[in-house]
Amino acid sequence: MALLKKINTQVNRIMKNSSLVQNICFDRVPLFIPRLSLTVKYCLAVKLLIYLLYCWYIYSEVPSVSSKFRSFTFGCVVVYHNKFFPRFIRTHSINSIRTFSKFQVIILFSIEKVTRSESKNHSYSKTDISDLHQGYNNPPSRFISR
């Protein structure tokens, strides 16, 4: 997990030098960002992947959540004619990246939850879940310590 944090830091440095909006919140992505460079597109894909792994890590460790969310799907990010906007696509595949001729880039992340038997022996507070919705830039303290 420390490696993910280092990668995220490097990605943030690259994105700071671009015209991309600085503070990207994954549940409220800006609707239109014109003329994204290829570097920024890759950086954004890496950030989404880091966020996906972070969410999987949190959800897989919390028994009360893993019993309720057997499967959940992440939205995909679509870059279409240099316009950047989020679109939510439902799928049952574990991890999909699909491309269509009309779209420059489509990134679709979805994951099917697998309950860990050893997670039943742990107990976590509700703040761990609420911290998840604040985004990757503000992770819970237990995530940083591992």
Curated annotation (Swiss-Prot):
Coiled coil start-end: none
Localization: Cytoplasm; Nucleus membrane
Entry keyword annotation includes Membrane: yes
Transmembrane segments: 38-60
Keywords for the protein's UniProt record, in alphabetical order: Cytoplasm, Membrane, Nucleus, Transmembrane, Transmembrane helix
A Pfam family of this chain: Pombe_5TM
Membrane-topology descriptor: Single-pass membrane protein
InterPro entries: 5TM-prot_SCHPO
Main subcellular location: cytoplasm
Leader peptide range in chain numbering: none
GO cellular component, one term: cytoplasm
Family: Belongs to the UPF0742 family.
Name of the protein: UPF0742 protein PB2B2.17c
Species the sequence originates in: Schizosaccharomyces pombe (strain 972 / ATCC 24843)
Organism placement in taxonomy: Eukaryota, Fungi, Dikarya, Ascomycota, Taphrinomycotina
